[in-house]
Amino acid sequence: MTNAPPATPKIGFVSLGCPKALVDSEQILTQLRAEGYDTAKSYDGADLVIVNTCGFIDAAVQESLDAIGEALHENGRVIVTGCLGAKKDANGDDIIQKVHPKVLAVTGPHALGEVMDAVHLHMPKPHAPFLDLLPPQGIKLTPKHFAYLKISEGCNHRCSFCIIPSMRGDLVSRPIADVMMEAENLFKAGVKELLVISQDTSAYGVDIKFRMGFWNGKPVKTHMTQLVEALGELAAPYGAWVRLHYVYPYPHVDAIIPMMAEGKILPYLDVPLQHAHPDVLKRMKRPASGEKNIERIQAWRAMCPDLTIRSTFIAGFPGETEAEFEYLLDFLKEAEIDRLGCFAYSPVEGATANDLPNAVPEEVREERRGRVMLLQEEISKKRLQAKVGKTMRVLIDEVNRTGAATARSGADAPEIDGVVYVKAPYEPHIKYKVGEFVDVKITGADAHDLWAEA
């Protein structure tokens, strides 16, 4: 009688945080699968659990600590990675080890090697790597029709409200050939929307002095504009979208707008402006000013009238006066940002902004955030209403039992923007499919979403 082969080790996985952290999770899962580990769908079925954490704001820290605690309670064998793993408390002690001393190991973000070393220590490899079992694009946690493409790690900025550089380090750009190869594999796998992400997409290549690389036998500089142009050319035969996130308004961004106007990439810019008043921006240690940003936005829209601009702002930053806040409101009225997120300032442990004088009371911070969002609702409603009657291409995300679909236009990034609700086809033989493009006519709008029919 032959002995049954040993059971394949199973790893549970919890992924928290931003799209950059999601990409880290995808890389870890890809490596686990390459080495023969299986993934478990529940704590009970896992031999150990990996928790990828977020540590940017206090709420994220608490969510991560709660997730670690749950994994320890339900499973007991937990490896922790991610931004919270690199974070210390006021005394310089490891936050995770202090709260959860029973975790098996703790690493910082973007630490594939360290995570795998910890896995090997507590759950040895089941067999030699089976790389041929993996799809070329690796394992993805997003739906099959869209994916995140991380082009760099870390950030060279030292914004006073942010601790990301202390957790993820300075900017490190990926070789452009590696980025292009991953993009090609994703398109070949059926991805219809590629979301380019980093901490600072505009700074791509700065750390390596825009070194010349090669793709398909041609020289391509490690620079944002050349990368975007190459991605647009690569996406064209697949009819796929390329969407840019975390774009700082450096001068060379102007060169990308004509590519958007020509349809090479989506006319969509995610630009984290944070504020408009020059004194507040100075305290934040942020570049540019409201006046300069207004000029840039107006110039961009002149070049590409269909441009959608998304941004985030902070209300109630330390020292923000009522006059400075009113300045921000005036800026928003003039800029008419299409998609906007606003956060009431929240102190982050380790951020230099904590030492700034004249903290704004919490109730005032929340009240100002509310005023920003109320104004933005009016702006968004006006801009979306202007789309009624127009025809646009949308990407189907979901189809319900009635045949109606939830989709997104080029103006809508997944999870953070609005959606387009598409009426079921009139012809019963026509069925929408997730991941396909459909041309629709916009029939209605509110402050967030659109309604349409094919």
From Swiss-Prot:
Cofactor(s) recorded in Swiss-Prot or TrEMBL: [4Fe-4S] cluster
EC number: 2.8.4.4
Pfam families (alphabetical): Radical_SAM, TRAM_2, UPF0004
Binding positions ([4Fe-4S] cluster 2): 155, 159, 162
GO biological process, one term: tRNA modification
Enzyme class, broadest EC rank: transferase
Domain Radical SAM core: 141-382
Entry binding sites for [4Fe-4S] cluster 1: 18, 54, 83
Protein family per UniProt: Belongs to the methylthiotransferase family. RimO subfamily.
Protein name: Ribosomal protein uS12 methylthiotransferase RimO
